[in-house]
Amino acid sequence: MIGETVHASCVAFGDIGILIRGNSGAGKSDLALRQIDAGATLVADDRVILRRAADAVTAHPPPALAGRLEVRGVGIVRLPYLDGVPLGLICDLGGPGGIERLPEPGWCAYLGVRIRCIDVAPFETSAPLKLRLAAHAAVGKADPETGAKAACDPDDRTDGQTEGQPTP
């Protein structure tokens, strides 16, 4: 099976995996912990194994790190985890000043599969909810908690100012 290991964290809301990428100390584990507090399940922390499965990419924990999450100031904690979930969203961590208000839909590719990609300021109070909404929207589902369905497609926007489609 084709795969690669990436420096990231991953959580899942149901069957939707969210890969959280960023530099060391950027807040990946902290955001994953807040996602778990909001109902997500840990997949992996610090390193994530990505595998191609048909037309999807699945995320898995390395065996030595399975069920472990680093909590800064506390240490390594053991949590329930999933061993494999399809990725629905990739989140790149950035500062609040660098995040566009109404960004064009972004895409990333792993193992030849395109996956929706967004930028998030990890320490904003709303970051966990933003990720959950974006993950459900990326796979065309309404969020089960709020019923909200975010508009990821430029044609779904109400401002009428967006041009073009995502690039292949």
Spans of features found by a protein language model:
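Glycine-rich phosphate-binding P-loop
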Residues: 11, 15-36
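Short, acidic/polar N-cap/turn motifs at the starts of alpha helices
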Residues: 8-10, 47, 105
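Pre-Walker A adenine-sensing motif
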Residues: 1-11
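Conserved NTP phosphate-binding and transfer environment spanning the P-loop NTPase/kinase superfamily
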Residues: 87-168
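Conserved nucleotide-sensing/catalytic segment adjacent to the nucleotide-binding pocket
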Residues: 37-95
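A short, structural micro-pattern
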Residues: 5, 83-85, 112
